[in-house]
Amino acid sequence: MEKRKVVWDLCSGLGGWTEAFVQDGWVVIRIEINPELEYVPFTRIWDVKDWIDWIDDLPHPDLIVASPPCTEFSCADWRKDRNTFEPDMSIVKACLDIIDYIKPKWWVFENVKGACPYIRKLIGHHKQFIGPFFLWGNFPSIEDRRLRRYKKDIAGKKSRQRTAQEVAMIPFEMSFQLKRAIETQTRIDRWC
């Protein structure tokens, strides 16, 4: 029997990044600081900045996905001159420190366009972007043709106000396409 693959979802919010992995039987560990989200399955309420306290107690991941809060980078939140604005990068750095310490086979770091100049200073240019989602990391390219509909939905009117977590949630289709890309790459690796 093949060992179950493990994914860690840092700053997981509602868990959108890893939903396809849950459905496929991966071991999913979601790390989130907001106690209001403890109801989300597989979520542990921990601070990524305190990672040294809990990291060695978890199974080693094949994949780490990280989506630090984007409020620091949102264009709508820039209240200061863009040339002097310096966001708090502590959560971003903690996520990157975890990735560097663990060295998983695959990792994806997601944030908004406004984060690009700041994250670029730490890990270079983004690898891929899909709609409002900018992606850095070591991962097979995600097919985005099926995600075009989502790009239109983002601006659509909703019958109710969405929570910050709902707005920030990675759509299931992105989770599915990432899982599919990793599975395809794994099959190619076995064949070579």
PLM regions with names:
Residues L10, E32, F42-I45, W51-L63, ...:
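Class I S-adenosyl-L-methionine
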Residues V6-I52:
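SAM cofactor-binding core of SAM-dependent methyltransferases
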Residues E2-R4:
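Phosphate-coordination loops involved in phosphoryl transfer and adenosine-cofactor binding
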